[in-house]
């Protein structure tokens, strides 16, 4: 099966002082969608973009916005990112599990879990789709 290669450009690589022109430049280069890493400083050590930035990007492109929620309690963010204009919402499976005892100390990354709350995960995937968005688990 020969699927075409798709390019997803990371917004984190952009010059945020020129975000609209960076989006245009990426579109002109032929990207297929924009990838937006959302980090909360808990699930992973970095803090990045929230729904306000996604909402600010949305008017500048018709290309899909793919948000990758690397956050604790991803269910708290689904509605906000859907409303902001995300087309694809990716959630981390580890966000639906209890952190292993050995990883509980602050600063222990990556998050490792023993089990996943599959019912909650399925419920949130359905919620994403009910917003008319594509849902992915990573």
Question: What annotation goes with each model-predicted range?
Answer:
Residues 15-18, 60, 64, 76-80, ...:
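Conserved anion-binding
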Residues 1-13, 20-21:
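N-terminal amphipathic alpha-helix/helix-capping segment at the start of soluble metabolic enzymes
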Residues 11-13, 38-40, 71-73, 93-97:
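Active-site-proximal loop/turn and secondary-structure-junction residues that shape catalytic pockets
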Residues 42-74, 78:
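A short alpha/beta connector and helix-capping loop motif
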Residues 19, 26, 37, 57, ...:
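Conserved, mostly hydrophobic/aromatic
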Residues 32-42:
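A short beta-strand-loop structural module common to alpha/beta enzyme folds
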Residues 5-11, 34-36, 57, 65-69, ...:
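Hydrophobic faces of well-ordered beta-strands that scaffold small-molecule active sites
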Residues 25-31:
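A short, Lys/Arg-enriched amphipathic alpha-helix followed by its capping loop at the start of a domain
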